[in-house]
Structure formats: C-alpha cells, structure tokens
Design a protein with these regions (language model features):
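Positively charged n-region of N-terminal signal peptides that target proteins for export
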Residues: 1-5
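Second-shell loop/turn segments in exported
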Residues: 28-33, 43-46, 60-65, 115-119, ...
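Extracytoplasmic/periplasmic proteins that interact with beta-lactams or build/remodel peptidoglycan
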Residues: 77-80, 84-367, 387-411, 419
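Beta-lactam-recognizing serine transpeptidase/beta-lactamase-like catalytic domain environment
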Residues: 324-334, 374-424, 429-657, 665
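Short, gly/Ser/Thr-rich active-site loops of penicillin-recognizing serine hydrolases
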Residues: 670-683
Length: 683
C-alpha cells in the first residue's frame, strides 16, 4: 500500500511539472510573440516616418490618438512643420534592448533616436513611443499612442513651431576712399490687396495706373491670375523710399505698402559694368548652387564684381527653429545658427575719377581705363553707354528690358572687358621694339611722297595710307608726332615677323592680366601672321591687333617707369606694387620714346595738342583705328587716346570712342581728355 502511494505521488508530481512546463512555455511564447509583433509594428512606423509617408503613419496610430487628431490634420501638421524647417535626411532608429514584454498596463514602450537635417543645422533627439494592442478593421496589432513630442522634443498639444531665416547682410563694395559703390537702402513694395481692390473706385485704379506707368489692364490681369483667396498682397512695383509718389499711393484704396532692404548702387550708370548687379536667382543658378545653401528666394550676383565675388559678398544665412505656445510665446529653441554677414570688398577704384570719366563718355559708345602709373592701382574702368543697375534690383518691365536689350549702341556690352584695334596708340610699342632690336634708329628717316605706299607689286592693289604728307623725310619723332602709318609699317617689316612678335610679346600680349576680373587677352594676331601685309598693318595697330583699354594703360606705364610695366591691382588687399613685366625695353629707348610722346602733346603740329592742359606736362598718343572687312569699303573709325602726366605721374588714361569718322577722328576726345586731367589733377 505504501508503495502504491509513492508511485501515485511520483506520477502526480511528474504530470504537474509537465503541466507547469507546458503552461510556462505557452505563456512565454505568447509574450515573446507580442513583443516581436510590437517591434515589427514600430519598425514599420519608423521606416515610414523616415520616408515622410505621413498618411501611412496615421494608419498605425491608436484609436485614442485618432480621436484627438484627424488624418488630414496629422498629415498637414507634419508637412507644414517639416516643410517649414526644411527637414530632410530623416532617420528614426528604434532602440531595442533584449526581450520586450508588455507592462502591467498591457502597453509596450520603445525608445528611439531621431536625426534630421534642417535649414538651420542637424537636429537629433531621443523619444519614447508607447504601443497598445488593439483591433482595428478586424486586425489585431500593436498601434502607436502619438503626441506632438514625436514631431519635436517637448512639444505639446496646442504648441506651434516657428522657423525664421536670418538673412546675412551682403558685403559692401567700396572705392579706395571708402565710398560705397554697392550698399543697401530701404525701398517700398507696392502691392494690391485683391479683396479691397475689387471694392476700389475706377478713378482710384486709374490713378495707380498713371502713377506707376502700368496699364490698368495689366493690373487687372495680375489680380485675376491670383486664384488663392488667402492672398493679401500682389506686388506690382517697388519704389525708393523717398519717391514722391509713395504719399499718394498710401492713400489709395486697395493698395498695401511694405518696406524692405535691397542692394543699392549709388553711382548708378557710372559703375554698372564694373560693379555689376544682383537679381533673383533663376532655376539654372539654383540647381548649381542649392548644395551651397541657396534657396529659390535668394538674390545672387548677376554680373561684374557682384558675380565674380559672390561667395565672399554673400555670407551665409542663419536661422532659428523654436517651439511656441498657442499665443506665440517662445518655449524652447530647438536649433539656432547665427547669420554670417558677407565680407566687404574694397577696391583701388576712385569713384570720383570713375564718375568724371563716365560723364565725358556719356552719350557716346566707348570705354576708358585709368591707372596710377607708378603703383598700378586701377582708378577707373568705364563703359558707355551704360544702364542703371538699380532698375534690375527694383524690377524692370518687359518694355524697359526690350528697350535696353535692343538699343543699337548696346549698353549691356562691357566694352572695357573687350579687345579693340588700338590704331596709332600701338605705334610707341613698334617704336620701342624697333629701337631695342636695332631695326630703326631715332635718326633714320623714310622718304615717301604722297599718302599711299606699298612694298612692291606683290601687294597687288593694297597700300598703306597716312593722313598727311608733311613734305619731307620723316624720322621717328616726326612719325610719332604726325602719326605716320607708313613709317611704322616699314619699321615692322624691317624687324621681320619673328622679331616683331618676340619683342611685342614682352609687353604681355596673349596673356591674361593678373587681376581678378575677366578681360579679353590682348593679341597680335588670331592665328599667326598670314602675310607681310598683315605684319605691316600691325606696326601701326591695325591688322588683327587688339588691346583692352587696361592693357594699353599698363603698357604705357612702362614709359613712366624706365621700361617696366607696373603690376595692376583692383582690390586694396591685392596691392602688390612692383612690376608685372620688367625691362620690356631698355631705359635709353624708354627715354627716347617718352620724349617723343611729350612732343605729341606739345608740338604745335602734334596730334595730341588739343588735349594739353596748361601747367601739366603730358605724354601721350592719339589713334584712329579703322574697322572694315575689305579694301575699298568705308569702315567705322574708333578714336583713341593714351596719355599720362609726366612730372610726378599720378594719372594715366586710355580712352576709346566709337564711330568718330567725319567728326574729327581722335580729336573728338581732345576736350574730354583735357577736362579729365584738369579736374583730377588741378581741382
């Protein structure tokens, strides 16, 4: 009997143990299944979160959450906030630690780390997600209890997110004395409030049309093209703050005025091509620069120094992302970056010299450069005709743009950046290299009768022509004073092509000038000399010879510096001093040519006598370059001057005016050069 009980209890214990083992195993499997299913649900949710599939995310929210926020509100909130802070590269990483089991309340909690890039800086934070087991649409699964802190940390119901961009101040461009060439000013945007405009009187609308020079039909079209009922401001014009029309417009029903700061160019037309202008970034520019932090609403340098030094002038924007309560009171700064203002650009340009020269060129098609012949500092780079760059900043109508773009004098063309045939202003170079190579001497004379000459019959009908026959032999001094083409054609032939090219290239032909502004390279030819006629023509600055006004000025600086060409500088920080080219001609040659250039200005028969300023000793050369495609035709003529003051040289000017035929040739420039030197050196 005792044995029987022992067997009974043994069996009972074994069976009971097996029962508990099976129960535990079942319970454990069920719990692990819940944990794994919760993990799977949350992993899916975080993946959709990173992909910004907000509509799909909403389907995984708990029933309780869905009672507090609609799908439309949920999606809209994420889109608006993430869009406002420019969220991208969103990564949500669940932080799973070992086995997961529901708590006593049946819920499961997961921590996660969210990182994202924003327009301010990257954001990273950890959060906690609570999941509940529910049945929705006949599907039992784990769903997320959502709240606003999922969007940004510490965010609560009713809170808002404010994202502000802090725009940098664009660096000023100033001249050598600190005078602003590009700065900022306050302007006023004139806009239509569609709702109020519809109630405005026809008389009032006509007055707006008249004041702003905008057809009433165009104003009506702008309003009708706006379909959004929430639009309260349609910009129609921008005016300077001191514009007298603003007072009248302020009183007009249906209009709204807003102030803003914009780029401003005080010297307007006078510096337009040098300084350039800024404008709204276009799609092509944006695509190239979007990785550098540019936005579609940014302005960007469009031309000139504004474009060349865009990176330095622009700076970088800052911004703030803050959480506020429903009343707008700030609660928490989520991210902040201070704006980095653009760096200033200080030039060697003298704004007063620039303005003076521009006034002399105004109403002509031409260009000029001015330098300090001893230091190489660039004092002026001038272009005419020009345009007011402020018109591009304020906004230009299609009609205004068409008038500017189709102007036959091409005001948008940057002439000082282009190469032109220098004509007789090239002759001092031929003289210098001829003397240096011993191909000519100061005493050598040519004996040619009449106005025309050719080497021999192999030239066919082609002849070199000079302006006057002075009735006798012509030596170097007379050739420069009288500007004799035949003398310099013969001098070039005497040197020969190899020597002519070798010596001329010492002056910097076919090289980029060492300044941070793109200019054409001056050249002696396009693709070598085709024949000796071209060589002869090149001796007096025709043929295929082209020079920029600045390069011509630098070449002439050699006559003020014993045969050395100064190092040019456009930026104050780049003032190098010294020489760009040394010993381009021997000192004795320099002295000889320089004395002849003085006679060009002082001799009663000198071609530059009309520009001489009493009390200022000047050295220079005039030139007339003829532009024609073939012999026999009458081409356009450009008039040139290259001149500097001799004693304590402070100013060297090169100037070219187009189409001077029938107006006196280079003498069109006489009075202009005289006034420039008088104003700059004597007043």
């Amino acid at each position: 009997m005792k044995k029987t009980w022992i067997v009974f209890w043994t069996v009972f214990v074994v069976v009971l143990s097996g029962f508990f083992y099976l129960f535990w195993d079942f319970w454990k499997d069920t719990t692990q299944s819940d944990g794994e299913r919760a993990k799977a649900a949350f992993t899916t949710y975080t993946t959709k979160w990173g992909e910004q599939k907000f509509s799909d995310m909403y389907e995984q929210l708990s029933l309780h959450t869905k009672k507090t926020i609609s799908k439309e509100e949920f999606v809209s909130r994420y889109q608006n906030i993430y869009g406002g802070i420019e969220a991208k590269a969103i990564a949500v990483d669940p932080m799973y630690n070992g086995d997961v089991m529901p708590g006593e309340d049946g819920q499961i909690n997961f921590h996660y780390r969210l990182t994202m890039e924003t327009f301010v800086e990257p954001i990273s934070f950890t959060g906690k997600a609570t999941l509940v087991k529910e049945t929705q649409n006949d599907l039992e699964d784990w769903y997320i209890h959502w709240n606003p802190s999922f969007i940004l940390p510490e965010m609560k119901e009713g809170d808002k997110v404010r994202a502000n961009t802090v725009y940098p101040r664009r660096g000023e461009i100033t001249d050598r004395a600190g005078r602003p060439l590009a700065t900022e000013r306050v302007v006023v945007d004139i806009g239509i409030n569609p709702g109020e405009w519809s109630q405005a009187s026809q008389t009032g609308k006509m007055e707006v049309s008249k004041l702003l020079h905008i057809p009433l039909d165009d104003l009506t079209s702008k309003v009708q093209a706006t379909t959004s009922k929430s639009t309260k401001f349609i910009r129609i014009a921008t005016l300077p703050q001191d514009d007298a029309r603003i007072k009248q417009l302020e009183k007009t029903e249906g209009l709204k005025l807003q102030k803003k700061k914009v780029r401003y160019y005080p010297y307007q037309d006078a510096t337009a091509h040098l300084v350039g202008y800024v404008g709204a970034i276009n799609q092509e520019e944006y695509e190239k620069r979007k990785d550098q932090g540019y936005k579609t609403s940014d302005v960007i340098g469009k031309s000139g120094l504004e474009q060349i030094f865009e990176e330095q002038l622009r700076g970088s924007a800052g911004g703030r992302i803050v959480i506020t309560d429903a009343d707008g009171t700030e609660k928490k700064t989520v991210a902040e970056r201070f704006a980095k203002h653009g760096q200033p650009l200080a030039l060697t340009i003298d704004a007063e010299v620039q303005q003076t020269i521009y006034q002399e060129l105004k109403n002509e098609a031409g260009t000029a450069a001015a330098i300090s012949p001893k230091t190489g500092e660039i004092l002026a780079l001038v272009n005419s005709p020009s345009f007011d760059p402020n018109a591009f900043v304020l906004g230009m109508s299609a009609t205004e743009w068409k008038q500017l773009n189709e102007n036959p004098q091409k005001p948008l063309l940057n002439r000082f950046a282009r190469g032109f045939a220098p004509g007789s202003t090239f002759k001092p170079i031929t003289a210098a290299i001829g003397l240096a190579s011993k191909a000519i001497t100061p005493a050598d004379s040519i004996h040619v009768r009449g106005l025309h000459w050719q080497k021999d019959a192999s030239w066919g009908g082609y002849e070199v022509t000079r302006v006057s026959d002075y009735g006798g032999p012509v030596n170097l001094e007379k050739a420069l004073v009288y500007s004799d083409n035949i003398y310099f054609a013969k001098a070039a032939l005497s040197m020969g092509e190899e020597q002519f090219v070798k010596k001329s290239e010492l002056f910097g032909f076919h090289e980029a000038l060492p300044i941070p502004y793109p200019l054409d390279k001056s050249k002696l030819y396009n693709d070598g000399f085709k024949n000796e006629i071209q060589l002869a023509d090149s001796g007096y600055g025709q043929g295929e010879v082209t020079m920029t006004p600045l390069h011509l000025a630098l070449v002439y600086s050699a006559f003020a510096n014993d045969g050395n060409i100064v190092n040019p500088s456009l930026l104050q920080e780049d003032k190098k001093g010294g020489y760009w080219k040394t010993n381009v001609m021997p000192a004795d040659v320099t002295g000889t040519v320089k004395q002849h250039l003085i006679q060009v200005m002082e001799d009663p028969r000198g071609t530059g006598r009309g520009a001489r300023v009493p009390g200022i000793r000047m050295a220079g050369k005039t030139g007339t370059a003829e532009l024609k495609q073939k012999k026999g035709e009458i081409g356009l003529e450009n008039g040139w001057y290259a001149v500097f003051n001799v004693d304590d040289p402070r100013l060297l000017v090169t100037m070219m005016i187009e189409d001077v035929r029938g107006r006196g040739g280079s003498h069109v420039l006489d009075a202009r050069i005289k006034r420039i030197f008088t104003k700059v050196l004597k007043e």
